Swiss-Prot record:
GO terms for molecular function: 2-polyprenyl-6-hydroxyphenol methylase activity; 3-demethylubiquinol 3-O-methyltransferase activity; polyprenyldihydroxybenzoate methyltransferase activity. S-adenosyl-L-methionine binds at residues 38, 58, 79, 124. Belongs to the methyltransferase superfamily. UbiG/COQ3 family. This is Ubiquinone biosynthesis O-methyltransferase. Keywords: Methyltransferase, S-adenosyl-L-methionine, Transferase, Ubiquinone biosynthesis. The keyword Methyltransferase applies. Pathway: Cofactor biosynthesis; ubiquinone biosynthesis. GO terms for biological process: methylation.
Amino acid sequence: MSQLNVDLQEIAKFEALAAKWWDQHSEFRPLHQINPLRLNWIDERAGGLAGKKVLDVGCGGGILAESMARRGADVLGIDMGEAPLAVGRLHAQQENVQNIEYRQIPVEELAQEQAGQYDVVTCMEMMEHVPDPASIVKACQTLVKPGGHVFFSTINRNPKSYLFAIIGAEYVLRMLPKGTHDYHKFIRPSEMAHDIRNAGLTLKEMTGLHYNPITKRYWLAPNVDVNYMVHTIKTGV
């Protein structure tokens, strides 16, 4: 591979915050708050996670990866930041979660090693942090078994998403550190659907993830104007 599909500035952002990953009152609070929603959504659409081989791409400190392991999945979490991975390993050890492993490896490289090895692949809150999202989608398609499920989440690119995800979340509500997101890396649902089709995946569902700053409640609904999640399957035998 001539060039890694990695933005070193993006990696550095999350490396610097690694020690706070499991602090539910830190900058990662939103990830902890949305995790039950996304975990249940994935679990239901995958027909249950228990007993399945699962890959979490861009796993960070392991909030989603460890929760899927707790549901009975055999989980591999991969990321390009070593500090978050170290935090994930330590937390799993402290919590005695044994059916989880972490590796520092690009997903494209793992796809060359382990094509068609996973029942479920997840890539959540990561696509908007890489230079080439289409390459990530293709690698995920390669890694999942025929009939398996691939899940993505990202942020739409439009004036509303700029207002909510950057101005609102980073500057007004201060839910996230300033500079967490780059508007130009946000991905329209049409662009995501295009990459999914080109990779050979079948789009099953898109749903929006919504937040009320007054009630501090998250919920899922069809509107995908800002944050959204995607369920795809790999057809064929």
